[in-house]
């Protein structure tokens, strides 16, 4: 046996050293795994296109303006704690000049307000303004003695109440996901109210006014449903609608002052005190305190009957109130503009997700002492539990809304159309067969119906549209 034969198999040299060397040297180096930071950067580069970047900016600005809007409104309620009725008038009449100028421009400088819109029955605006006035009255008067986090949780009750109103007046039907989500939302609202039910007045909450605030969702839900009924067959300009709604809302809001005569403190206003209360509210708007503490001359303690002794009679703190009012009105207008932009460019699904994000963010801001000062509301176990339940219920409701099922009525209509066309469409089916199996008749694009355009319009306004009605118009258009 030669020396080569005694070598191990892998050591045999057949003169291919150059080949083996070349083969080893040309092997592909091992692929390095991309780091998470690089993956994130590449994802951002692919996502940040000219189309998606504006949408992301709109959504972020909507969330930011929404949080600021809620926080500023609560700070205004704290400033006007003794003048809740005056605050409700400011939040109504303050927007009238803005909407009037915008409507005038739309009517006389553009063609956005046609004759059909101008001839729209005024009584429908009156009913809508009445419902919105009652809603705003309950929100402001009840919100003065309801903490910021609890306000945001109670606001979510409008979803189940709107479902009930839609079921009664529109005969709307809902899926099990939507019904389950609404039930969980109501459970979260009840859990959030437990501290007030058990502990009475605490954390700036007064039980009576917590329920007073909660009642506001009833006229709010009725307003949503009425808007769906009243604007059944017309596409209306946003600014035109906002002006008339704001006008009638302000007028009806002004005549609601007798209700304060029977309300407990701090919202009590006797009939003879309405004018002095409005005057003192105007002074508070200018930064002047009217209700001041009274001290004992000898002990330097608060005298009997002075403000500040209990939560039902609070001293004025009107410093820089007018600045907060101006900032709030500016942010509120921007907030409503971003609502339209998000709905227009991102759609209702992204809008719903953004609303869900706003809810926990506002509760976080209400717990920061630097922002809320003495009105800071720390987290509690029950408030966190209520928040989680409501978020879970909102998720279930949104999932149920996104599940598209053809409504039974549209299915029956299509079956009836097929049945009616069974005898009369024989010629058309024969003609189609004569063209051959491979021939296809081009599908014509059907024009959008007035109902479909109206639903799009209200979606941009942020008005809830029953899912089956919106899907029905899509089925007709498709």
UniProtKB/Swiss-Prot annotation:
Cell compartment(s), UniProt: Vacuole membrane
Biased composition (Basic and acidic residues): 406-415
Region (Disordered), start-end ranges: 1-30, 404-446
Topology with respect to the bilayer: Multi-pass membrane protein
Membrane spanning stretches: 53-73, 84-104, 125-145, 150-170, 179-199, 206-226, 238-258, 323-343, 353-373, 377-397
Cytoplasmic-side segments: 1-52, 105-124, 171-178, 227-237, 344-352, 398-478
Sugar-modified residues: 296
A GO MF label: xenobiotic transmembrane transporter activity
GO cellular component: vacuolar membrane
Cited Pfam families: CRT-like
GO biological process entries: amino acid transport
Alphabetical keyword list: Amino-acid transport, Glycoprotein, Membrane, Transmembrane, Transmembrane helix, Transport, Vacuole
Keyword field contains Nucleus: no
Vacuolar side: 74-83, 146-149, 200-205, 259-322, 374-376
SUPFAM superfamilies reported for this sequence: Multidrug resistance efflux transporter EmrE
Family classification: Belongs to the CRT-like transporter family.
Function as written in the Swiss-Prot or TrEMBL entry: Nutrient transporter. Involved in maintaining the osmotic homeostasis of the digestive vacuole.
Protein name: Crt homolog 3
The organism of origin for this protein: Dictyostelium discoideum (Social amoeba)
């Amino acid at each position: 046996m030669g020396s080569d034969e005694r070598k191990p198999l892998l050591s045999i040299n057949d003169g291919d050293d150059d080949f083996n060397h070349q083969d080893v040297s040309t092997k592909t180096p091992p692929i390095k795994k991309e780091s998470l930071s690089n993956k994130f950067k590449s994802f951002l580069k692919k996502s940040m296109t000219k189309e998606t970047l504006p949408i992301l900016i709109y959504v972020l600005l909507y969330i930011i303006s929404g949080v600021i809007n809620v926080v500023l409104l609560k700070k205004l309620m704290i400033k006007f704690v003794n003048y809740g009725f005056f605050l409700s008038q400011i939040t109504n009449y303050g927007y009238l000049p803005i909407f009037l100028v915008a409507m005038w421009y739309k009517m006389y400088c553009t063609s956005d307000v046609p004759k059909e819109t101008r001839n729209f029955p005024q009584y429908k605006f009156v009913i809508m303004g009445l419902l919105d006035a009652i809603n705003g009255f309950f929100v402001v008067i009840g919100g003065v003695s309801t903490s910021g986090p609890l306000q945001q949780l109670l606001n979510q009750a409008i979803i189940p109440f709107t479902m009930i109103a839609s079921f009664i007046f529109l005969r709307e039907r809902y899926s099990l996901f939507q019904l389950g989500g609404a039930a969980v939302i109501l459970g979260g609202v009840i859990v959030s109210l437990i501290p007030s039910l058990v502990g009475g007045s605490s954390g700036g909450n007064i039980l009576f006014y917590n329920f007073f605030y909660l009642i506001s969702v009833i006229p709010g839900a009725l307003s949503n449903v009425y808007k769906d009924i009243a604007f059944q067959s017309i596409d209306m300009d946003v600014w035109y609608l906002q002006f008339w709604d704001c006008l009638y809302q302000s007028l009806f809001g002004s005549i609601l002052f007798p209700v304060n005569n029977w309300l407990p403190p701090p919202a009590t206003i006797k009939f003879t005190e309405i004018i002095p209360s409005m005057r003192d509210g105007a002074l508070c708007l200018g930064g002047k305190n009217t209700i001041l503490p009274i001290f004992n001359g000898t002990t330097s303690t608060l005298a009997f009957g002075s403000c500040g002794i209990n939560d039902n009679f609070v001293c004025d703190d009107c410093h820089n109130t007018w600045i907060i009012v101006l900032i709030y009105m500016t942010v509120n207008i921007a907030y409503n503009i971003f609502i339209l932009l998000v709905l227009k460019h991102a759609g209702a699904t992204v809008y719903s997700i953004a609303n869900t994000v706003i809810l926990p963010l506002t509760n976080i801001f209400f717990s920061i002492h630097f922002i809320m000062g003495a009105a800071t509301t720390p987290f509690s176990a029950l408030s966190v539990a209520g928040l989680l339940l409501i978020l879970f219920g909102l998720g279930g409701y949104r999932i149920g809304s996104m599940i598209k099922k053809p409504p039974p009525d549209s299915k029956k209509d299509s079956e009836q159309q097929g049945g009616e066309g069974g005898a009369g469409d024989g010629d058309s089916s024969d003609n189609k067969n004569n063209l051959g199996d491979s021939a296809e008749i081009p599908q014509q694009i059907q024009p959008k119906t007035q109902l479909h355009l109206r639903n799009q319009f209200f979606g941009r306004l942020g008005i809830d549209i029953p899912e089956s009605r919106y899907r029905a118009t899509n089925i007709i258009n498709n």
